[in-house]
Regions:
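Phosphate/diphosphate ligand-binding glycine-rich loop within oxidoreductases
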Residues: 1
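Structural preference for beta-rich elements and adjacent junctions enriched in aromatics
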Residues: 4-137
Length: 137
């Protein structure tokens, strides 16, 4: 079974972005990249700084039918954007998109917060990220 939530963020206009991919049981991958194929992955120290709370618990399980509601709460510190020197999120302007990917399920599905105008599902397209501003603290 493979269900992933993804958070993509470009904190500046360099063309690079971070992608945070988290499974429904809290397994996490963090990469910094300009394109899908070439990424610099976060160190174990960065990975440990990201708190995860999966509603389904941390153990793998087979796909099942019925009530499939779940959530994963991530607490991502600004330092997790490890190629930047952020110390807080306050007032940061960035471009982001959020996704849900169930590509290896018996009924594959893909969702995004903002639409992606591509012929097939592809989340690694920063041109479809949306500008946001984090609240001032």
């Amino acid at each position: 079974m493979c269900i992933r939530d993804r958070f993509f963020i470009a904190p500046d206009d360099s063309g690079y972005y971070y992608n945070f991919e988290c499974t429904c049981i809290g397994r996490l991958l963090v990469g910094f990249r300009r394109e899908r194929e070439h990424a610099t992955h976060a160190t174990p120290r960065v990975m440990e700084s990201i708190l995860r709370n999966p509603s389904l618990g941390p153990r793998p399980f087979p796909e099942h039918e019925g009530d499939n509601r779940w959530s994963v709460v991530l607490a991502i510190p600004p330092q997790a954007l490890f190629m930047h020197s952020l110390t807080d999120w306050s007032g940061l302007k960035a471009k982001v998109n959020l996704y849900k990917c169930g590509d290896k399920l018996s009924q594959p599905h893909f969702l995004s917060w903002k639409p992606i105008a591509a012929p097939k599902p592809d989340f690694h397209l920063p041109e479809f990220f949306e500008q946001i501003k984090f609240s001032e603290i």
